């Protein structure tokens, strides 16, 4: 390098991409994909803080999970969720019976709770129960999503019929009511079906998340294929579109509209839709944005996002082209037995609150920081498989001698 012609990059990045200094690929991305101030100035970047809640929190022999979008009716917050009231832990496909669940969201119903402040909740009871034996949705109802449309309320949910099948194969059902407190009237057939046996969503369509957008009702959902091989699409998200809440819902020809993500979490933002993408896929743990509701772009990378989040967005169904974002919601936290910590032996979940700054109407600099550090307990958490087990340590030691070599040059 000829230092006589070298001009260093300035300590304070210019607002616009400079043309008088050489830019590496990373610095070009800073201007083309991100913005010079970094995370602190990114509207769609946030940390997440968590709080326990009362009324629907951690309770022995009860599992609560997968909360809906939260709505506010007459100054009261409402949320719906999957509830399994059963002191028998999930037993898998082989151990399931009419009274023993296969998984944590088996033998479940849709319940609801209300709150005045979002922290203290009162469980109000069952909203939608499983169907009578032999009818659609007689085994389990789970992962609900709520829609408010023309003064009516619509719940969409996974509807399992008969004993559990391999790979969580299921369709999306629906119920409606004139009041958030019910009674709810069941629509006894799927509103969104699975794809074909070779399609990306051929096994499951679940986690429905309704939004009203550009005069249409959009239901985003998580899909997974029948093929569970290493090359198969593990999970992605799609959207089905209708003119009215009862359908017919037509799947977008662009599905899947994400290449990553587990549970769905979307909200209106400016003139488009934002989405929290977590857990699965190459773009996991990001916030993404789409102006048309179909084509999403990564806008930020986030740390420890909420699991199965249901956000409060007062304009979720406003369709006004001016989405204001979100500041809080509910999520679920899993608890399980540590007797066999590295097996899939989920026992139950409970609901918790998350707070964030993905809003245009507030400013919380304390939620825009980076360089997050975690405690010893997090790094060595055996439940999350962060700590090596004794058997894993022994296997590594046994193989290490044949893999590791003396440092080159010594």
Predicted segment positions?
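Carbohydrate-active catalytic/glycan-binding domains of CAZyme proteins
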Residues: 1-410
